[in-house]
Every structure is written in C-alpha cells, then in structure tokens.
Amino acid sequence: MLCPPDVAFEKRHFKRRDGNKVVPPSIALVAGLESGFLFKLSAVEDVARRGQFPGLLTEDGFLLMCEESEHIRDAYAMAKHLVALAPDGIFTRATLQEAAGKVGSTQDTLSVEEVDALFNALDSDNRGYVSVDEFMDALYGEEGREAMREIRREYMRRKIEVEGEPSWRMRPTPKPTRKLRQKRKREQGQKRKQGQRQKQEQGQRQKREQGQRQKQEQGQKRKRERGGAQRPPPPKQKAGCGC
C-alpha cells in the first residue's frame, strides 16, 4: 500500500559520511511514487540544486516537495501513468531509457546513470524487470490490480473501435465444402470395408482352425480303434487235475 512520504524516504535514503540522510533525484522519483506523488525530474533537480547538499535531497527537501505536489490517491490515475510508461506491462532498463527519451522537455530526460539508479531501486529482487501489476499491488493492493485490469479493458475497447473486432472473433467456423464432404464419405466407406474384410478373414481363420482340430481328433480316434482290434486275446487257463 502507499506509504507516508517520510517512510518512503527512510526506505530509499543513504547516509553521507557526516551522517545526513539524502537521496539523489532519480531515487526521489521512486520514493515519490511509493508515497503517491509524481514528480518531474527537473523540479526534483531544482530543489536538490538549491538544497543543503547540491545534487541531493535531504529529508526536509523531499517532504517539502510532497507538500507542494498533488497526491495521486486514485489508483486509476496512477495506472494510466504507468501503462503509458510501460505498455507491455513490465519495466526494464531499456523501457525506462526509452521513456526518458520521449519526455517533452530535455530538462526532464534521465541520464543513463539515473536510469540505472532508478531501475535498481525498483528491481529490488534483481530479476531484470519490474512488473507493473506487482508495483500497483504494492502501492494500492487489490484496488491497484483492479485499476490495471480496467485500464487494459479500456485499451482493448479503444483498439477494437479503431481496428475492428479481432480476426479470431470475426471469422466464423468454416463449413465443410462439397469436396471435403466427399472425401470424408470415401474415408468412412473405406473404413467400413476394411472392418468387414477383417471380420471375414477372422471368421475364415477360426473355421480353418476348427476343421483342423476336428480332423486331428478323428485321426486320433481311428488310431485308438485300430490299436484295440490288433491286440491279441488273453491266454486261456488250463483246467486243474484235481490231485
């Protein structure tokens, strides 16, 4: 969520050797965003130039800028600003450098060193990019995420008004042509014939196997019968003498 200006300054400052807390102008831009203020670089540099330590902002100088600036409490307004800065949804060093080059006044153009400092302050996890959604979530919570979704929906509505409906929505599912229907019909007929042929071959194979089994059984039966006819009769027992 948005934090008070003094908390944002405390989070981003560094200490000089004399113990004074300061921030460079590029980091003051980040602290301003985190507390709900959009500063112009030229205005920040002007305050830093006239401050106690030329080129740096003290806490008093930063808080004074916040008091004199309009606070962006509306998540929707902040989302519009960030979408204009990063339309693809992420900040990279190149994104910030390009955005700095597009600023109308040359006074507000960030140098390469300032872009690096600004990006390093935003990319605290060293991932190489900063998600706009994550940034809005950190500032406004669910309200920030919903604002980003609304901005994107509005962008799509405007794009459709200019370019028309996306082609994947406009183009209906094509109906099969006569040639395609005939092709499908031939394929289905071939599948049916193939199935009938396989069924017929299976029946013939089963019939042959059954005939062979019957033939084997009959041969074994005849063999057993012939063996029984050729066996000699058992010998007769002689009558006893009665002694």
Curated annotation (Swiss-Prot):
What are the sequence repeat spans here? 181-188, 189-196, 197-204, 205-212, 213-220, 221-228
Residues of the region (Disordered) are: 166-243
Keyword list (alphabetical) reads: Cytoplasm, Cytoskeleton, Microtubule, Repeat
Sorted alphabetically, the Gene Ontology cellular component annotations on this record are: cortical cytoskeleton; cytoplasm; microtubule; microtubule cytoskeleton
Q: Which organism is it from?
A: Trypanosoma brucei brucei
Q: Which GO terms describe its molecular function?
A: calcium ion binding
Q: Where is the composition biased (Basic residues)?
A: 176-196
Q: Per its UniProt record, what InterPro entries does this chain match? A: EF-hand-dom_pair, EF_hand_dom
Q: What is this protein called?
A: I/6 autoantigen
Report the SUPFAM superfamilies cross-referenced here: EF-hand
Q: Where in the cell is it found?
A: Cytoplasm, Cytoskeleton
Query: Which stretches are tagged as biased composition: Basic and acidic residues?
Result: 198-220
- Provide an example Pfam family for this protein: EF-hand_8
Q: PROSITE patterns from the entry? A: EF_HAND_2 (PS50222)
Cite the residue spans of the region called 6 X 8 AA tandem repeats.
181-228
Question: According to the UniProt entry, where is the signal peptide?
Answer: none
Please state every residue range assigned to the domain named EF-hand. Answer: 110-145
Primary site of residence:
cytoplasm
Q: Which residues cross the membrane?
A: none
So what does this one do?
Answer: Microtubule-associated protein that may be involved in cross-linking microtubules.
Gene3D superfamilies hit by this protein: EF-hand
Record bears the keyword Repeat: yes
